[in-house]
């Protein structure tokens, strides 16, 4: 897969941008979380802030929203 941008690796994952949207990859460049986010920040304490459909939220490493 080609990425137009890759963020900093943190806790084994990095945010990466595909053609338009962001997802998360591991150090082998394998997709771990789908490329569906408008914004994606690095993980910190197993939580990352993402933007989806104009909404800011926090997700865990499984992609589930955290409150």
Across the structure, where does each feature detected by a protein language model lie?
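Residue-level detector of conserved, function-critical positions
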Residues: 1-67
């Amino acid at each position: 897969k080609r990425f137009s941008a890759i963020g900093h690796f943190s806790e084994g994952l990095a945010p990466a941008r595909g053609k338009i949207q962001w997802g998360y990859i591991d150090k082998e460049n394998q997709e771990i979380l789908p490329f569906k986010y408008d914004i994606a920040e690095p993980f910190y304490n197993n939580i990352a802030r993402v933007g989806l459909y104009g909404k800011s939220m926090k997700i865990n490493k499984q992609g589930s929203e955290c409150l």
